């Protein structure tokens, strides 16, 4: 049983990205210009390799992960989906608190702690977002967010087997973010942790289902569309130091 759960978690990483919370038609138009931080919108020196891995991952997603997301969509109503989304967000909150602490942002650290305590108690284990109604909105910080805070650029775009799309800065997030820096992992049973992680990834895949389906059906180059969209969404979610400029990649 544990092996099946672990396999589900790995497969759910192919397309699941919480950064893509909405779909905008403009997001599909790849533009290799420079963003407000001075970074190349996408630096992809390993595109030939990445495209091969992308094709491999896409097959696995179509055969296994996408059907799971569709099944989740069909068997649950909006109320259940909202509860799952709230629960998943609450589980991530201690990690956000830790990363804000590493960024020396003590105000947001304490707000994240209070958000977790309120939702875990009054929100019945995080099923209801009580804290959001009293001025403590949901925020998500990963170790990659912390590295960006201290001036680490995204680096080369990468598509890794099974893991999926990432970049040099964020590629360790799946291990460091989900395990090493999340306090809950040290106080809960392994089976519970794996179950929560599996539910989280399936929920993430469901969230991006409209986006991925649209791209696969309408884009002339799904690789470029997904690369551009994921990079833009991720860069929009991090905060670099004031006056920070990403280094120009070497030719």
Curated annotation (Swiss-Prot):
Signal peptide: 1-18
GO cellular component terms attached to this protein's record: membrane
Annotated GO biological process: intermembrane phospholipid transfer
InterPro entries registered for this protein in UniProt: MlaA
Transmembrane segments: none
Record key words, sorted: Signal
PANTHER family recorded: INTERMEMBRANE PHOSPHOLIPID TRANSPORT SYSTEM LIPOPROTEIN MLAA (PTHR30035:SF3), LIPOPROTEIN VACJ-RELATED (PTHR30035)
Family membership: Belongs to the MlaA family.
Protein name, as recorded: Uncharacterized protein RF_0076
């Amino acid at each position: 049983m544990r092996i099946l759960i672990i396999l589900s978690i790995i497969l759910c990483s192919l397309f699941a990205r919480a950064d893509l919370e909405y779909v905008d038609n403009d997001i599909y138009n790849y533009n290799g210009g420079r963003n407000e931080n001075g970074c190349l919108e996408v630096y992809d020196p390993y595109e030939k390799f990445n495209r091969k891995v992308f094709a491999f991952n896409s097959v696995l997603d179509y055969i296994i992960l996408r059907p799971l997301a569709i099944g989740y969509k069909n068997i649950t109503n909006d109320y259940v989906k909202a509860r799952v989304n709230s629960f998943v967000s609450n589980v991530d909150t201690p990690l956000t608190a830790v990363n804000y602490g590493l960024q020396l942002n003590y105000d947001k650290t304490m707000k994240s702690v209070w958000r977790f305590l309120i939702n875990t108690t009054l929100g019945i284990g995080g099923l209801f977002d009580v804290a959001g109604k009293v001025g403590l909105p949901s925020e998500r910080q990963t170790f990659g967010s912390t590295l960006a805070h201290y001036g680490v650029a995204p680096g080369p775009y990468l598509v890794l087997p099974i893991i999926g799309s990432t970049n040099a800065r964020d590629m360790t997030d799946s291990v460091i973010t989900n395990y090493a820096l999340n306090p809950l992992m040290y106080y809960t049973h392994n089976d519970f942790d794996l179950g929560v992680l599996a539910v989280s990834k399936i929920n993430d895949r469901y969230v991006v289902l409209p986006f991925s389906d649209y791209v696969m059906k309408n884009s002339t180059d799904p690789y470029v569309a997904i690369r551009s969209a994921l990079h833009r969404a991720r860069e929009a979610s991090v905060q670099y130091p004031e006056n920070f400029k990403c280094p120009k990649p070497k030719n």
